[in-house]
């Protein structure tokens, strides 16, 4: 068996006039994340981790922020397409672990829905998807509430050829 671990990262600026979508969940808040797509920072980090684990590059290589097809794109659809490309490369996704770093809003009430979305999109049992939420203890741009960051790790495996 060929086990691979991928690491993903994303950050987006918080701005007025946009919805806040994290993990495919719309979260009530006065600001949202700025981006070409729906700017779902968590799903972008997970997508990057999966592409990285399969040595398929990164999210920008597959879903460029200069491509008008992805303007306002639903990041859940992008994650599903990522999973299909990882599978096409011969890998199965085993688990995902992720962390969201945001001073506000409180994300704990939304974690279960995020996990359910990610598990559904990746075709995984819920117990193979983890999402954690942390603050930056009021330090730096994250602590000042200027943006939200996400980090993710993913394990994929390719069965040995017979």
Swiss-Prot record:
Which PROSITE patterns does the annotation name?
ISPF
Alphabetically ordered keywords of this record: Isoprene biosynthesis, Lyase, Metal-binding
- For whether the record's keyword set contains Aminoacyl-tRNA synthetase, the answer is no
Which SUPFAM superfamilies did the record assign? IpsF-like
* Residues binding 4-CDP-2-C-methyl-D-erythritol 2-phosphate, per UniProt: 10-12, 36-37, 58-60, 63-67, 144
Pathway(s): Isoprenoid biosynthesis; isopentenyl diphosphate biosynthesis via DXP pathway; isopentenyl diphosphate from 1-deoxy-D-xylulose 5-phosphate: step 4/6
Q: Which GO terms describe its molecular function?
A: 2-C-methyl-D-erythritol 2,4-cyclodiphosphate synthase activity; metal ion binding
Q: Which cofactor does it need?
A: a divalent metal cation
- Identify the EC number(s): 4.6.1.12
Cofactor binding remark = Binds 1 divalent metal cation per subunit.
| Pfam families linked | YgbB (PF02542)
Q: Which reaction does it catalyse?
A: 4-CDP-2-C-methyl-D-erythritol 2-phosphate = 2-C-methyl-D-erythritol 2,4-cyclic diphosphate + CMP
> What is this enzyme's class at the first EC digit?
lyase
So which residues are the signal peptide here?
Answer: none
User: Where does this protein hold a divalent metal cation?
Assistant: 10, 12, 44
Q: Which GO terms describe its biological process?
A: isopentenyl diphosphate biosynthetic process, methylerythritol 4-phosphate pathway; terpenoid biosynthetic process
Subunit structure, interactors included:
Homotrimer.
Family assignment?
A: Belongs to the IspF family.
Its biological function? Involved in the biosynthesis of isopentenyl diphosphate (IPP) and dimethylallyl diphosphate (DMAPP), two major building blocks of isoprenoid compounds. Catalyzes the conversion of 4-diphosphocytidyl-2-C-methyl-D-erythritol 2-phosphate (CDP-ME2P) to 2-C-methyl-D-erythritol 2,4-cyclodiphosphate (ME-CPP) with a corresponding release of cytidine 5-monophosphate (CMP).
By what name is this protein known? 2-C-methyl-D-erythritol 2,4-cyclodiphosphate synthase
Recorded source organism is Burkholderia thailandensis (strain ATCC 700388 / DSM 13276 / CCUG 48851 / CIP 106301 / E264)
